[in-house]
């Protein structure tokens, strides 16, 4: 008996000595919660599992009892979920379709030349994210909820999108509680004005009259995510400033002819929200101190109760989705740097967690996990900066490890306990690297001022923040100071290109994915011009604009390429219109002509991300191959 127990313990220990690999990472199921069932007793969710062999993902839908139990696969979620697109009175259904509005193709103008593939544009917004504008726009329709009913286009003839491109879905339109109106999100600007503005509004379409009213005309920035409470009060997310996509995101409630900003005095930015069942409070998710947590803000209505924002959850994990409510519990998804998202319930009174789904438990139970540590580093201007340090599995402080400085994109995105299928810290650590991930200037979760500082200062204080982080961690005896690497994507790729010119021989190798190499050509080719207008301070031809000129000279990585002296891997997607292909090409050409060891990893059909499973595998293999060669 003792031998059996000993053998079992040894076997379990051996199982847990496996580490994450690219192959395992791309076998993990990815949860997408769909909602709470009509009877309020079950969670409905989808699991997408990549198939490398088929080069696609396969999805299955499940129901899981909230009270606990086994998940059951179902073929169709429509039977168990309330259809938000059906009007509350059941008479109508709302949906969206793409409609051809503008002439773009040469053959549209010259019918006798049908084999032409020319495209003709008179303004910007000729391409967005990863697709070219072919004159088609997303429009919201409604029709009677019966067989054979004819749909009515509520944006008929308008060359605007709702749902918003490129990522909007049916969350961009909702029914009013009385079924008399459809509310929808739309940026009613076209061409060049569309490309330079973030002024998205919430419109109300009256079914009886066909009239449309702009409910947020007084606000010049983003107005998004409309949602009614059970009491019929409308809430939405709002950013104030036109052109600033990373502005503070507040919760606004329309009440008795007023617009109440519930989060105006809270020093943070809301990710997304959900009304409580009784309509007396709103739960929302926001970044805080290197994580994403659940918050609550009360809606006072006509009472004299003060508005208060309270943080509900706390810990080294990310709360990603608010699925719904069940008694005193809220159903959420939760992830951390070692675990992909799973579904949990959180008891609001007991403050206790219960894990409900275990989609990837069988895989994680076999793995030796990396350890994540919080570290607070003093910056060059005397601030305290959070730095996540991820240590390899079975870490031994008596050994020396090669170490990677991870540069986050955005630049105003939060660096939290996220679980990425590309920039996966667990996988980097499993390959024997320590990862240093600083919450440098520009990150959400450390106050609005910290987030806003990076605009017009891309190559300034933030570069000192990076170097403060790596220098501080490199003091540890277990860091091999002769084997430091620097990696990142998007703004993180910009950071890699910039640091390659100022690192003073700290780093031995660099990897940049879809990074900005030349700020001037970036301004001339990116599609969301409002972003560069704001973050660079203006256009490169504005010679009297000191902030803009600094962005195109001092803060332009291209102007530091003569100081590059270490190997660099440059990765680029061919359909990336956010950071277009020329950025990677310019960087690679400069490195090659300067005689620097360099490699260009090109994905012709990928955008700013790498989404196809086989391409993702090559990305990982080349990433670690490069590090093995050069670090």
What are these model-derived regions, one by one?
Residues 30, 47-60, 76-82, 96-139, ...:
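A flexible loop/linker signature enriched in serine peptidases of the S9 family
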Residues 35, 85, 174, 227, ...:
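Conserved beta-strand position repeated across blades of beta-propeller domains
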Residues 38-39, 88-89, 177-178, 229-231, ...:
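Residue-level detector of Asp-centered blade-edge/turn motifs that repeat once per structural unit
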Residues 40-44, 90-93, 182, 232-235, ...:
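Hydrophobic beta-strand positions that form the internal "hydrophobic ladder"
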Residues 65-69, 145-148, 206-210, 255-258, ...:
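Short loop/turn segments that connect beta-strands within beta-propeller blades
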Residues 94, 117-122, 127-144, 148, ...:
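Non-catalytic accessory segments flanking enzyme active sites
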Residues 190, 242, 349-351, 359-482, ...:
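Cap/lid segment of the alpha/beta-hydrolase catalytic domain
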Residues 429, 437-631:
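Active-site-proximal cap/loop segments of hydrolase catalytic domains
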């Amino acid at each position: 008996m003792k031998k059996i127990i000993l053998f079992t313990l040894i076997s379990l220990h051996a199982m847990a000595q496996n580490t994450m690999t690219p192959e395992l990472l791309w076998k993990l199921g990815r949860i997408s919660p769909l909602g709470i069932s009509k009877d309020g007793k079950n969670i409905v969710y989808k699991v997408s599992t990549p198939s490398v062999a088929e080069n696609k993902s396969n999805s299955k839908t499940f129901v899981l009892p909230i009270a606990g139990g086994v998940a059951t696969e179902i073929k169709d979620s429509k039977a168990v979920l309330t259809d938000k697109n059906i009007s509350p009175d059941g008479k109508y259904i709302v949906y969206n379709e793409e409609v051809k509005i503008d002439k773009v193709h040469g053959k549209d103008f010259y019918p006798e030349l049908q084999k032409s593939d020319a495209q003709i544009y008179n303004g910007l917004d000729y391409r967005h994210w990863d697709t070219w504008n072919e004159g088609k726009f997303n429009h919201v329709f409604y029709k009677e909820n019966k067989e054979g009913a004819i749909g009515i286009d509520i944006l008929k003839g308008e060359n605007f999108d709702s749902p918003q491109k490129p990522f909007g879905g049916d969350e961009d339109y909702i029914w009013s509680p009385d079924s008399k109106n459809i509310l929808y999100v739309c940026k009613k600007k076209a061409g060049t004005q569309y490309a330079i503005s973030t002024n998205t509004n919430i419109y109300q379409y009256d079914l009886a009259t066909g009239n449309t009213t702009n409910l947020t005309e007084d606000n010049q920035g983003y107005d998004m995510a409309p949602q009614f409470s059970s009491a019929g009060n409308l809430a939405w997310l709002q950013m104030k400033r036109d052109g600033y996509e990373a502005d503070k995101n507040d919760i606004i409630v329309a009440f008795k002819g007023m617009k109440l900003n519930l989060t105006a005095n809270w020093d943070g930015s809301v990710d997304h929200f959900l009304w409580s069942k009784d309509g007396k409070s709103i739960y929302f998710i926001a970044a805080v101190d290197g994580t994403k947590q659940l918050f609550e803000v009360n809606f006072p209505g006509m009472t004299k109760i003060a508005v208060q924002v309270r943080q509900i959850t706390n810990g080294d994990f990310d709360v990603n989705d608010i699925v719904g409510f069940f008694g005193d519990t809220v159903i959420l998804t939760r992830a951390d740097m070692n675990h992909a998202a799973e579904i949990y319930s959180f008891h609001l009174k007991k403050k206790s967690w219960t894990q409900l789904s275990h989609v990837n438990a069988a895989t994680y139970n076999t793995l030796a996990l990396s350890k994540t540590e919080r570290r607070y580093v003093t910056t060059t201007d005397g601030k305290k900066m959070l730095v996540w340090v991820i240590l390899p599995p079975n870490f031994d402080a008596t050994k020396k490890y090669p170490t990677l400085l991870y540069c986050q994109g955005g630049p105003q995105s939060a660096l939290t306990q996220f679980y990425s299928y590309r920039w996966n810290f667990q996988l980097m650590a499993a390959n024997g690297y320590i990862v240093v991930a600083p919450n440098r200037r520009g990150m959400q979760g450390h106050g609005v001022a910290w987030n806003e500082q990076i605009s017009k200062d891309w190559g300034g204080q933030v570069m000192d923040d990076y170097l403060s982080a790596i220098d501080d961690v490199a003091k540890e005896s277990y860091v091999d100071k002769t084997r430091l690497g620097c990696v990142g994507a998007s703004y993180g790729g910009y950071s890699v290109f910039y640091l390659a010119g100022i690192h003073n021989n700290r780093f031995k190798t660099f990897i940049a994915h879809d990074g900005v190499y030349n700020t001037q050509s970036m301004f001339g080719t990116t599609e969301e011009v409002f972003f560069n207008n704001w973050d660079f301070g203006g256009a490169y031809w504005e010679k009297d604009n000191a902030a803009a000129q600094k962005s195109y000279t001092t803060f332009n990585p291209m102007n530091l390429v003569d100081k590059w002296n270490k190997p660099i891997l440059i990765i680029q997607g061919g359909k990336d219109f956010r950071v277009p292909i020329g950025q990677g090409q310019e960087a690679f050409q400069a490195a090659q002509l300067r005689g620097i060891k360099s490699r260009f990893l090109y994905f012709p059909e990928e955008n700013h991300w790498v989404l196809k499973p086989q391409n993702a595998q090559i990305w990982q293999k080349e990433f670690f191959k490069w590090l093995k060669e050069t670090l």
